[in-house]
Amino acid sequence: MQTRVLGRTGLEVSVLGFGCGAVGGLMVKGDAADQERAVARALDLGINYFDTAAMYGNGESERNLGRVLKRLKPDLYLGTKVRVPAAERRNIAAAVVGSLEASLQRLQLDHVDLFQLHNHILAAGRDSDLTPEIVLGEVVPAFERLRQQGKTRFFGITAVGDTAALHRVADVRVFDTAQVSYNMLNPSAGTTVAPGYPAHDFGNLLAHTKSAEMGVIAIRVLAAGALSGTVERHPLGSPQVDPIGSGRDYGIDVERARRLEPLMREGFADSLVEAAIRYVIAHPAVSTTLVGYSTLDQLEYAAAAANKGPLPPAALDRLAQLQGSFVGEPR
């Protein structure tokens, strides 16, 4: 599998990553043997970046991944995340440190390659959302101390929130990576969208991350499954999901996804899932494309799609035409 450099970290990561969250659900609620088989097969396929978080299954994802890694002892790159709860905002440094230490215990590791902030970043922070001032003034110093202690090699953000706030944090150039929501339903992180496009406008965020030499981990590549074109969800996956930056609800995302099916009829891809993965890989600023899995078959299919490479320019042009039909619709 092709690899790309994860920004200024210098890490060579596979273009397809292994998401261990609840949307796919395998590493949260799956059978232990299936979890081990999936991780082992992913490694065989050349996937070397695995992404989890303390909040996935209230730590179950980390526990399950830790158990599998202890058995397999693989050579891979691992990222996890901290979400600072509203109740702990008075002492963010302690919350950050405590979260990583608990994650390391569950993962049965002494360090991770990448530690990421999971909170949304908004100009006016509320509840568990954080302002750029708090992120830069309180979170970053705590992350730096953890790096100095050898508990993480690099640190990053989850780039969800107010566009201006995200741009500001990226432009400061202190974070090594960003998880960026980017998919065929909302391409605004990677291009300029027309006024009236029914999605959150991330304002070409990938231009800011590139300028800051940040590695980019693309998330919501399949729009939480909507880009399969079906409303049915696997029993292991989250029964309900909230879109990040796309339609008002999952059903709207599925309806719009189906309107992209001319890509298949015209021979650009075999399925919406394949097109979605290859679309994200086509952006040169994306380092790795994170997909969550429910089954081993889904993993195999995603890897085969990634190995076909980026969508060709003609497919991207046709997709832009289809996306144009969304303009003016209510979000």
Describe the residue ranges of each PLM region:
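Active-site groove signature of glycoside hydrolases
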Residues: 104-129
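N-terminal binding-site loop/beta-alpha segment at the start of enzyme catalytic domains
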Residues: 1-76
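Acidic (Asp/Glu)-rich catalytic clusters
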Residues: 8-10, 66-76, 104-110, 169-173, ...
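Beta/alpha (TIM)-barrel catalytic core signal, keyed to glycine-rich beta->alpha loops juxtaposed to Asp/Glu
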Residues: 120-330
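Active-site mouth loops of central-metabolism enzymes
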Residues: 21-33, 82-94, 128
